[in-house]
């Protein structure tokens, strides 16, 4: 079987159907075909239909702009669908109430209002005892996602879209930068333009950082009240859970967020988690009838933002990775992608979501995907020795989580005057581990644009870090993104994470409780955790016991250049640790780096002292030499300290 169309869309969920409908509305004679693996498995079914950019607390930037633009279109968009099909979509711009259990740090958004404990309970009686207030987001709303997808499917068919159900795409055939055909279990399909909109399954066809995030959900039946139809009248978006009342008396409870690959089915643990969170938010629902529960796979990406725009071939367009916002972003995605296909019109909204954003840089790319070696080769720098030798003459290698390194100096990538200076400094230092702030790289923060691609990751081991995370939950989420970022850059087996949980914005001191909590979870998930901590011997021991690969006590506050102010505690940590000890933060001079190594530290991590030096490249070399000298001195053993002088030459048998 061979079928030819003007546009072939791979994926029959809400995004694929929305694009198909938009194309046909703009150009009726266009031949559009949609290939759907299994309509029932679409991520659209594993959703609650919330239109909630403010309740989701999406940070200001391109993603929020995209979400707001889509929400603004929603009323007109669903009205058009309802007119086409005569079907309801359940669209309701009802506003969303966001109860909280802890006092907020600042305003949620300019369009949102804070409600104190008394006021929020007036708005919605029956909230749990732990609720201390909440935000009212008047512009957010909801839609019945199942009704919406059914209406889209009906609209597509009525407009003449050919929907091929039960078709599994096996490969995308390419030649000379063009897709020539899509190969499936039911034959080949050809078209002038192709759209990849198959969510989590995209990575099976192209090497894209899209992965399944399992979500479990359930529905309860609300009892009808005497004076009001149902006891819960408002959408509640609480901490880690949401409750969405439908007009037919159902209450949608969601959702878990689990990176368990393709593990199917609802689980007792998942349902227990849902119920526990929901009952804490609204206790009365603990007595309501369970009507249904289900699960599905949301398409996640390393930065939790979609891929929109041209793919690796000129006639292939991507519309994938919408994660938690597929329902919300359907109208704007359909508009942007249809404009791209029909008019080659690239909206400013789409630029930040280019599929190339993880792979492009204004600097010459040095990205390599060659296999990583078990022992990293020494960087070519004739000024530095490869590694110290112990008394038996064998190489003295640094070993972390089973991986061996010649260099004991780790460096960072921030604060450099330019990307070129950073590249030259890394090379000059002789280091083999470079830490990268996941959040800043993913958001292209100032000074971090193109940073991930500026380093040859075939010779440098990436150490993703969770800088900027104030809670354990944040750090765990960012660690997972860091692992995916490392995979994308060719280090498929990189499970390292430098764990930073820092709520203190003045002194940047790490939170010991949050660090321990995050470390325990990340170790369970298979990470090699390198935790940044205060020089606390008891905490260091506890982190070692939960399975951390190293401990990284600070010498003094980050970026202070104060040197090692807590040598006694670091010495205790070194004496008792059975994992490598890395002195991290505060080192300002090569002599201080050597001091840490002479104390018996296994490695040092130095960034600011190099990046902020008058000559960073020369300082990087000096730090590398000092690290080697300090290690060699430690292995050699210093002379005993004596109370009295002892001349180097004998005092007897002198001439004359």
UniProtKB/Swiss-Prot annotation:
Residues 1-395 are annotated as: ThiO. The gene is thiO/thiG. Interacts with ThiH and ThiS. One of its GO terms (cellular component) is 2-iminoacetate synthase complex. InterPro entries: Aldolase_TIM, FAD-dep_OxRdtase, FAD/NAD-bd_sf, Gly_oxidase_ThiO, Thiazole_synthase_ThiG, ThiG. This is Bifunctional protein ThiO/ThiG. Residues 396-656 are annotated as: ThiG. One of its GO terms (biological process) is thiamine biosynthetic process. Pathway: Cofactor biosynthesis; thiamine diphosphate biosynthesis. NCBIfam families: thiamin_ThiO. It comes from the Bacteria. The keyword Translocase does not apply.
């Amino acid at each position: 079987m061979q079928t030819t169309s003007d546009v072939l869309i791979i994926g029959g969920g809400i995004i694929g159907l929305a694009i198909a409908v938009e194309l046909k509305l703009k150009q009726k004679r266009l031949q559009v075909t949609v290939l759907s693996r299994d309509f029932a498995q679409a991520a659209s079914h594993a959703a609650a239909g919330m239109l909630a950019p403010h309740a989701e607390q999406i940070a200001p930037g391109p993603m929020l702009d995209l979400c707001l633009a889509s929400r603004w279109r929603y009323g007109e968009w669903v009205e058009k669908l309802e007119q086409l099909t005569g079907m309801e979509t359940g669209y309701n711009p009802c506003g969303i109430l966001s109860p909280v259990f802890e006092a907020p740090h600042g305003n949620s958004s300019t369009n949102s209002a804070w409600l104190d404990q008394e006021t929020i309970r007036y708005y919605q009686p029956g909230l749990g005892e732990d609720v201390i207030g909440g935000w009212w987001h008047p512009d957010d709303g909801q839609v019945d996602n199942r009704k919406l997808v059914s209406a889209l499917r009906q609209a597509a068919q009525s407009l003449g879209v050919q929907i091929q159900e039960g078709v599994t795409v096996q490969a995308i055939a390419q030649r000379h930068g063009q897709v020539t055909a899509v190969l499936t279990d039911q034959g080949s399909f050809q078209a002038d333009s192709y759209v990849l909109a198959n969510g989590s399954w995209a990575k099976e066809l192209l090497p894209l950082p899209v992965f399944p995030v399992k979500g479990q959900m359930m529905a309860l039946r609300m009892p009808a009240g005497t004076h009001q139809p149902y006891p819960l009248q408002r959408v509640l978006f609480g901490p880690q859970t949401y409750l969405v009342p439908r007009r037919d008396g159902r209450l949608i409870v969601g959702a878990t967020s689990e990176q368990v690959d393709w593990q199917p089915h609802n689980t007792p643990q998942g349902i227990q988690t849902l119920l526990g969170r929901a009952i804490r938010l609204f206790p009365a629902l603990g007595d309501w009838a369970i009507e249904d529960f289900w699960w599905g796979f949301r398409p996640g990406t390393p930065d939790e933002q979609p891929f929109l725009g041209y793919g690796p071939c000129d006639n292939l367009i991507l519309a994938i990775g919408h994660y938690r916002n597929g329902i919300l972003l359907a109208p704007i995605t359909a508009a942007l992608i249809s404009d791209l296909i029909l008019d080659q019109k690239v909206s400013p909204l789409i630029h930040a979501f280019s599929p190339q954003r993880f792979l492009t840089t204004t600097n010459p790319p040095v990205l390599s995907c060659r296999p990583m070696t078990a022992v990293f080769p020494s960087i070519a720098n004739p000024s530095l020795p490869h590694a110290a030798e112990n008394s038996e003459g064998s190489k003295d290698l640094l070993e972390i989580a089973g991986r061996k390194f010649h260099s004991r100096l780790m460096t960072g990538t921030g604060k450099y005057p330019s990307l070129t200076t950073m590249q030259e400094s890394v090379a000059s230092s002789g280091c083999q581990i470079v830490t990268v702030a996941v959040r800043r790289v993913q958001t292209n923060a100032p000074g971090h644009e193109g940073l991930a691609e500026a380093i040859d990751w075939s010779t440098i081991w990436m150490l993703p870090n969770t800088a900027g995370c104030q809670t354990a939950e944040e750090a765990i989420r960012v660690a997972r993104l860091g692992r995916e970022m490392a995979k994308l850059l060719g280090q498929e087996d990189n499970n390292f994470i430098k764990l930073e949980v820092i709520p203190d914005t003045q002194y940047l001191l790490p939170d010991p409780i949050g660090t321990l909590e995050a470390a325990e979870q990340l170790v369970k998930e298979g990470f090699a955790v390198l935790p940044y901590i205060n020089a606390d011997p008891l905490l260091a021991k506890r982190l070692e016991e939960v399975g951390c690969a190293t401990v990284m006590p600070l010498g003094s506050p980050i970026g202070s250049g104060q040197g090692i102010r807590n040598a006694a505690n670091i010495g205790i940590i070194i004496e008792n640790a059975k994992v490598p000890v890395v002195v991290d933060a505060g080192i300002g001079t090569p002599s201080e780096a050597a001091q840490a190594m002479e104390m018996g530290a296994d490695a040092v991590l130095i960034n600011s002292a190099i990046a902020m030096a008058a000559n960073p490249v020369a300082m990087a070399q000096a730090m590398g030499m000092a690290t080697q000298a300090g290690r060699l001195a430690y292995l050699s053993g210093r002379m005993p300290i004596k109370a009295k002088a002892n001349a180097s030459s004998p005092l007897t048998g002198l001439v004359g």
